[in-house]
Amino acid sequence: MKKKLLVPLILFLSITIAFLVQLKRNAQGEDIKALESALVGKPVPAKNLTELFENKTYTNELFQQGEPVLLNVWATWCPTCYAEHQYLNKLAKEGVRIIGLDYKDESPKAMKWLKDLGNPYQVVLKDEKGSFGLDLGVYGAPETFIVDGKGVIHYRYAGDVNEKVWTQTLKPIYDKLSEQQ
């Protein structure tokens, strides 16, 4: 009888402790959309990726061009991606380098989406099966990574990139990396 109660009690206490730790982090002003990532401080995973329109193959050297870049994970099935798309177009017009990762999507739908809504990406990579997303630790779309000019990931953000997120969170990191290059 005591053993039957011990497992649920331990599980309950573990969940309660995790909840309290997260509440404390939020109260201290930590950004709940900033996901911890084992890849922060490490290079973009090495993988051969195909470009959406030209079927050209890229390696992680794409992220080693000497300038920082946003790696934006998106999909046509993602309503939040639709919401952020107009703002990404604005950033691209301002000169922000953005590489798109079309995540678990159908290529014809993605090409039509970009034709109809505009293409903010310098390069659009296909990840139809989600294997590169898995390597990045992506669990949904949209997610955005800030990568420096040497291909090292500096930040990971889950959610839509909008004016507030850009100016308060992402832009300071992007600008700092731009100055260092």
Curated annotation (Swiss-Prot):
PANTHER family: THIOL:DISULFIDE INTERCHANGE PROTEIN DSBE (PTHR42852:SF6). InterPro entries: Periplasmic_diS_OxRdtase_DsbE, Redoxin, Thioredoxin-like_sf, Thioredoxin_CS, Thioredoxin_domain, Thioredoxin_ResA/DsbE_sf. GO terms for molecular function: disulfide oxidoreductase activity. Residues 38-175 form the Thioredoxin domain. This is Thiol:disulfide interchange protein DsbE. It is found in: Cell inner membrane. Pfam families: Redoxin (PF08534). Disulfide bonds join 78-81. It is a single-pass membrane protein. Belongs to the thioredoxin family. DsbE subfamily.
